[in-house]
């Protein structure tokens, strides 16, 4: 079966409809808050190390996504933390020669470093730069997979930094994918660059720009090999240019990534935009840990005093600026959740009374005297579950569905700040807590997360956009929680 990714009757197409309908509102919040935090951390060793680790992660994962090599997870983390050295690649940790893998990793990291340089030099995207980027990414690759006239797989010499001269028709899942024919690649690439320039001029949001540029580039598939790596580098360029994080697509994201690209093939760019937003949230959560590291690592008195003054100034009037806006969002979301749980409680209670006739379900709100255990649970599990460090001093609230039958369980939505000092972002963390009494009358609590990620929102987001995102996320959480409750009756 043949799948035409690039269509000759249209070529690459513009963004369909109003781009505002595609945007992810939290990305602008990430841009603003990360920009403020990055400025505070400017010149710090922690910021430099974070950027280096991020670049190394990008370099490793972009090759894994393209099946250049495999590296096991433990070694991946070692390489991210300690640079690319062949001795870290023990026997069996990769499926390719160690020195070759290290060369590819260094090439890919150097290429991303080149993207950062491109942005800092305020250069404009051009076809010549895209060729330059391709040459950097594939510097150590000399051959690529091909097919001979007898339909046998062979290795063919790789052409770097120039457009393909033979049709590119890879096969996946029994389908043959066809892209732009070689004779039209140059004109289509000119159109791609012109389209990107128009988006920049018109202020199209970064996540939409990145999704469009990535997908339309892959539709053209201008190079003999390495198109996926170049596409992710171009998307990263757009995001970094906007003050965001590079596009780190990990092996765990691969299925969703390919599905999003296939949705874009049939005209729906939104899943790819949403994936980019999700990956930005993931990097932002990692970035919030830097401030905590600096607060703990500061040994200079003046630096410590400067940090103290910044926090004191921020806490001077909690009703103004970013704090007031963020806290107002949190109160609205908590109230919406209280109303939703109040409607849900009767159905849950009716179900539990099939098991225990005296079962009861009530909605409970945050109370100072009962908050401490929940704060402890959140502090202990936030990083393990969701990869961030909580700040319950800046803000905390919770809404809870308290269920008592033969067992006792609490379904909790906990709201609190992130970052130290508070950076204008808050999260909602949902979890189930089951409490059981053992034969010695000791109560054991078991906590179960009921979401893939915490809900992250920002002071700079519009109230209606935060609420729209939250309601969709919350309904998915409710489904997961009810399934867990069913499994633990």
Predicted regions and their residues:
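FIC/Doc superfamily catalytic core
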Residues: 1-224, 229-489
């Amino acid at each position: 079966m043949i799948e035409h990714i690039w269509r000759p009757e249209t070529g690459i197409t513009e963004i369909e409809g109003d781009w505002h309908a595609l945007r992810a509102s939290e990305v602008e919040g990430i841009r603003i808050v990360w920009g403020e935090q990055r400025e505070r951390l400017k010149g710090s060793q922690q910021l430099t190390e974070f950027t280096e680790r991020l670049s190394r992660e990008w370099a490793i994962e972009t090759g894994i996504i393209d099946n250049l090599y495999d590296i096991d997870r433990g070694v991946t983390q070692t390489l991210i933390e300690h640079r690319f050295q062949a001795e870290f690649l023990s026997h069996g940790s990769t499926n390719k020669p160690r020195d070759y893998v290290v060369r590819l990793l260094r090439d890919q990291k150097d290429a991303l470093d080149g993207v950062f340089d491109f942005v800092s030099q305020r250069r404009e995207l051009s076809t010549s730069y895209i060729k330059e980027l391709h040459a950097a990414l594939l510097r150590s690759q000399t051959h690529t997979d091909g097919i001979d006239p007898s339909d046998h797989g062979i290795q063919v010499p790789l052409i770097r930094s120039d457009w393909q001269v033979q049709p590119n028709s890879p096969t996946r899942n029994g389908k043959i994918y066809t892209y732009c024919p070689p004779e039209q690649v140059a004109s289509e690439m000119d159109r791609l660059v012109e389209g990107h320039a128009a988006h920049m001029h018109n202020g199209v949001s970064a996540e939409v720009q990145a999704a469009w540029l990535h997908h339309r580039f892959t539709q053209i598939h201008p190079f003999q090999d390495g198109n996926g790596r170049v596409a992710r580098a171009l998307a990263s360029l757009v995001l970094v240019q906007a003050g965001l994080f590079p596009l780190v697509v990990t092996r765990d994201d691969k299925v969703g990534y390919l599905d999003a690209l296939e949705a874009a093939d049939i005209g729906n760019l939104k899943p790819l935009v949403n994936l980019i937003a999700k990956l930005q949230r993931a990097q932002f959560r990692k970035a919030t840990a830097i401030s905590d590291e600096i607060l703990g690592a500061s040994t200079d008195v003046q630096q410590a005093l400067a940090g103290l003054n910044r926090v004191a100034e921020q806490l001077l009037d909690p009703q103004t600026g970013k704090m007031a806006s963020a806290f107002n969002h949190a109160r609205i979301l908590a109230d919406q959740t209280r109303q939703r749980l109040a409607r849900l409680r009767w159905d849950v209670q009716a179900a539990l009374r099939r098991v225990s006739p005296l079962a009861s379900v009530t909605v409970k709100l945050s109370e100072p005297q009962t908050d401490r255990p929940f704060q402890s649970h959140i502090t202990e599990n936030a990083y393990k579950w969701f990869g961030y460090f909580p700040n319950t001093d800046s803000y905390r609230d919770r809404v809870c569905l308290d269920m008592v039958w033969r067992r006792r369980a609490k379904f909790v939505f906990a709201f609190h700040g992130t970052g130290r000092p508070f950076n204008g972002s808050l999260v909602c963390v949902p979890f189930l807590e089951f409490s059981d009494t053992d034969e010695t009358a000791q109560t054991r609590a078991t906590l179960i997360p009921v979401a893939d990620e915490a809900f992250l929102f920002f002071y700079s987001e519009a109230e209606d956009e935060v609420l729209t995102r939250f309601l969709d996320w919350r309904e998915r959480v409710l489904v997961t929680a009810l399934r867990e409750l069913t499994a633990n009756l």
